[in-house]
UniProtKB/Swiss-Prot annotation:
The lineage of its organism: Bacteria, Bacillati, Bacillota, Bacilli, Bacillales. It comes from the Bacteria. It is found in: Cytoplasm. GO terms for biological process: nucleotide metabolic process. Belongs to the Maf family. YhdE subfamily. Its cofactor is a divalent metal cation. It catalyses: dTTP + H2O = dTMP + diphosphate + H(+); UTP + H2O = UMP + diphosphate + H(+). NCBIfam families: maf. Keywords: Cytoplasm, Hydrolase, Nucleotide metabolism. One of its GO terms (cellular component) is cytoplasm. The gene is maf. Nucleoside triphosphate pyrophosphatase that hydrolyzes dTTP and UTP. May have a dual role in cell division arrest and in preventing the incorporation of modified nucleotides into cellular nucleic acids. This is dTTP/UTP pyrophosphatase. Coiled coil: none annotated. It comes from Bacillus pumilus (strain SAFR-032).
Length: 189
């Protein structure tokens, strides 16, 4: 059986692979995650997922590697992880009372094959008060998440509606990822 490697330090992606029952190793890619303003949100997440998978694949040519990236898009603007509390507040104000898209790109790659895809989910936020935003930022939760919120944590309190794959918003569309991994000969549980 091929070795499976997750090219991410995301605890949420780890939890989802654990939930599915995979045996895998973690080797985080240390590539700088920069959004390319010349690419669409869908192109960005797929490109970043491929870069992460390529980075780890070079070091482990016999392994099957999963690279993933998540961004939030609103009004054509891509939101990655905030640089600081001020940027987190700006992002949350931007999302307040509106519908945005959460896109997660995934690359599954072996020595001689690569499959890249993305999932897009629509998320609508309630209108947020500045007090709610400030209190949420003080928890520290939004500082390592695309769009400055975690739907699986306290950020769930901001979500009015979701249309699409919840797990994609968390960081990995696990059902589709499992199906792709199975075509590489990697099966869960």
């Amino acid at each position: 059986m091929n070795q499976l490697i997750l090219a991410s330090q995301s605890p949420r992606r780890k939890e989802l692979l654990d939930l599915a029952g995979f045996s895998y190793d973690i080797q985080a890619s240390h590539l700088k995650e920069e959004i390319n303003r010349n690419l669409s949100p869908a192109e960005n997440v797929q490109w970043l997922a491929e870069q992460k998978a390529n980075d780890i694949q070079r070091l482990n040519p016999k392994a099957v590697v999963i690279g993933a990236d998540t961004i939030v898009a609103i009004d054509g603007k891509c939101l990655g992880k905030p640089k600081d509390k001020k940027e987190a507040a700006f992002m949350l104000q931007l999302l307040s009372g509106k519908t945005h898209q959460v896109l997660t790109g995934v690359t599954v790659q072996s020595e001689n094959r690569k499959e890249t895809f993305y999932e897009q989910t629509e998320v609508t936020f309630w209108t947020l008060t500045q007090n709610e935003i400030d209190r949420y930022i003080e928890t520290g939760e939004p500082l390592d998440k695309a769009g400055s919120y975690g739907i699986q944590g306290k950020g769930a309190l901001f979500v009015q509606k979701i249309d699409g794959d919840y797990f994609s918003v968390v960081g990995l569309p696990i059902a589709k990822t499992v199906r792709v991994l199975e075509t590489f000969g990697i099966t869960p549980f």
